[in-house]
Amino acid sequence: MEVKLWNDKREREMYENFAELYAIIKATEKLEKAYIRDLISPSEYETECQKLIVHFKTLSASLKDMVPNIERFAETYKMDCSAAVYRLVTSGVPATVEHRAAASASTSSSASVVAECVQNFITSMDSLKLNMVAVDQVYPLLSDLSASLNKLSILPPDFEGKIKMKEWLLRLSKMGASDELTEQQARQLHFDLESSYNSFMAALPNAGN
């Protein structure tokens, strides 16, 4: 006696699609583990992972009414494929692409902070040249510079510029807002800024190239 697993063609297609979805998730889980264990090269991993993601997106779109939640589907069939679910549902791109994007964002962010530091150095030095030596004029500029230097992770805590700006901010905080730097103080501050700027530029990666 023949046992039917489905009642009609539509139900048969549904089960076939379920089986295919199951296979894609399982294959992705195996691929993720192989990549983590260095059993496959990054380029091979990326090619295969991209194929699985494309197949998954196409299939899950056609099954969205029957399988609205992939995580629940995986739980129902006791798949234990958390890496695959993350890759297919949450990330949607191969790990190699994800890592490149993160590195690019980090580089872009660092470049932005470097530009901010340079701008703050130049603004602070220019203001002294223009004889803007009142405490309420100098303090905000040095405060901005100090904050931008502290945002740059490549600079060590004992970086010359960080220490000198902290010393100057402490000195200025003990003065009145309308007090002005003496000619000697202004000259020393400009020297410290210029020295710190040169050290800053030398500390940047590839500064010597």
Curated annotation (Swiss-Prot):
It holds the Pfam family VPS28. Keywords: Endosome, Protein transport, Transport. It comes from the Eukaryota. GO terms for biological process: endosome transport via multivesicular body sorting pathway; protein transport. GO terms for cellular component: cytosol; ESCRT I complex; Golgi apparatus; trans-Golgi network. Residues 1-99 form the VPS28 N-terminal domain. Coiled coil: none annotated. InterPro entries: ESCRT_assembly_dom (IPR037202), Vps28 (IPR007143), VPS28_C (IPR017899), VPS28_C_sf (IPR037206), VPS28_N (IPR017898), VPS28_N_sf (IPR038358). It is found in: Endosome. The keyword ATP-binding does not apply. PROSITE patterns: VPS28_C (PS51310), VPS28_N (PS51313). Its main location: other. Residues 109-205 form the VPS28 C-terminal domain. Component of the endosomal sorting required for transport complex I (ESCRT-I), composed of ELC, VPS28 and VPS37. Interacts with ELC. Belongs to the VPS28 family. Component of the ESCRT-I complex (endosomal sorting complex required for transport I), a regulator of vesicular trafficking process. Required for the sorting of endocytic ubiquitinated cargos into multivesicular bodies (MVBs). Mediates the association to the ESCRT-0 complex. This is Vacuolar protein sorting-associated protein 28 homolog 1. It comes from Arabidopsis thaliana. The gene is VPS28-1.
